[in-house]
């Protein structure tokens, strides 16, 4: 993966944009695996290139979401490329190729929000709250056995 850190990110983005513009779908979920897969190689330059590619692709999606008055949620299930090295007891730099336990971002890009809701994460907020949050943004109530949404509607 470090030999082609862009992977298929642009192709995924192009296909997603085409589907979004088709008007056939209300919801889509995609995975840019670049940071994860390239992070496992321990190649810092490749990881930087991978994440620059993802940044570029996410910006394209944001632009289309704004054009279509949509909502974009950006998150991850774990870190990897965020910590590429650790140090030995002697100070030697050692590649770190495993997942990290670092907190991951959770961003809702909603240019049309109009103060319809507030972000009110519970103290134990985590990945298990994203399904109900997504359902709420789509206009549905989450099942009672789901963890609570991260949103409170006004």
Predicted segment positions?
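Feature captures the catalytic ectodomains and active-site-proximal regions of enzymes
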Residues: 1-154
């Amino acid at each position: 993966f470090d030999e082609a850190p862009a992977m298929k990110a642009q192709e995924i983005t192009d296909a997603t944009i085409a589907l979004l513009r088709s008007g056939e779908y209300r919801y889509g979920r995609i995975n840019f695996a670049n940071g994860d897969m390239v992070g496992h190689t321990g190649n810092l330059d490749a990881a930087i290139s991978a994440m620059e590619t993802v940044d570029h692709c996410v910006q394209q999606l944001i632009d289309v979401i704004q054009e279509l008055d949509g909502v974009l949620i950006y998150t991850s299930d774990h870190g990897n490329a965020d910590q590429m090295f650790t140090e030995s007891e002697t100070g030697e730099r050692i590649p770190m190729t495993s997942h990290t336990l670092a907190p991951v971002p959770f961003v809702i890009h909603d240019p049309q929000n109009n103060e319809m809701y507030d972000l009110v994460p519970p103290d134990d907020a985590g990945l298990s709250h994203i399904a109900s949050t997504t359902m709420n943004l789509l206009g549905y109530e989450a099942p009672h056995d789901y963890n609570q949404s991260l949103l409170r509607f006004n």
